[in-house]
Every structure is written in C-alpha cells, then in structure tokens.
Amino acid sequence: MISHGLISAALFLCVGVLYDRVQSRLISSYGGIVNILPKLSLVFAIFMLGALGLPGTSGFVGEILILLGAFQKSFLVAILASIGIIFGAAYMLWLYKRVIFGKLEKIELKELKDLNFSEGIVLFSLAVLVLFFGFYPNLILDTAHISVEELIKNYEQAIILNQSMVK
C-alpha cells in the first residue's frame, strides 16, 4: 500500500503538471513532449513503470507478493489478477506512448516549460523513493511484518472464540 500511495500520488502530480501547462484532459491534446519536457517525461516514466510492477521499482515488490499469495490460495483469482495486470500494463504503455512519444502536432506545445524547481524536488524525491524501495523493500516489509503477525494472531483468536461460541 505504501508503494501504491507513492506511485499513485506521483502519477497524479505528473498529470497535474501536464494539465497545468496545457489545460486539457484529452490525451489527443498531447503528444511528442519528450523533447520539450524531458524531466517530466523521465519521472513520468519511472512512475509509470512502477505502476506496471517493473522489477527494481516498489511496484514490483507489491505485485509479486500479492500474486504469490494469490497463487497459494486460489489459482483462478491469481490468473484473473494476472490478466488485470497485463491489461493495466497495456493501457499505461499506450497512454505513455501517446502523451510522451506521440507525434508533436500542436505547435503551442513547443512553448511549454519543463518542471520548475519545486515540482522537480517533489517528483524526483518520489522517484528516488519508488526506486529505493524497489531495491530495498525490507525496510518496509520488516516493519510491516510485526503488525501483520499481530493482526493474524488476533484474527486466529477471534476465529477460535467464534467457533467456541457456536458450539
């Protein structure tokens, strides 16, 4: 959930920066901005790849743990989740291609300014965290492990208590 929070917030910030500059929500209003906004294109790529679950990003850690758990419990659910991941990845790649690498058809896009200092600090800080937790996930997992063990213990006690009340 930490990874999802970082990546989702960062993607919304990237879209917000684009909207602030272009004032349009239509994908067709964009295209070919990689040469005009290289810093934004870079951080957008990092967050998009994190959302896809690319190894080396925090998104990979979350997705692989969820899929491994799903395969242990229900093969059908795991397959459905995997299909959802594939469709999500296809959409994200399509979106990135159209917005960032598409053909530059609108002359007014050439006047856009790349990230300012404060936008850059926020977005690059989030990018560093997404990459850092992708390579060092145990900083989060070890901390969460204690809480999860306690939650499981309480859940098991509640089940035992419930079963004893039913008898």
Regions found by a protein language model. Give the residues of each.
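Cytoplasmic/organellar membrane-interface segments at the starts of transmembrane helices
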Residues: 37-39, 93-167
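Interfacial and helix-entry/exit segments of alpha-helical transmembrane bundles
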Residues: 5-88, 92, 109-129
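Short alpha-helical catalytic segment bearing the HExxH-like zincin motif
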Residues: 1
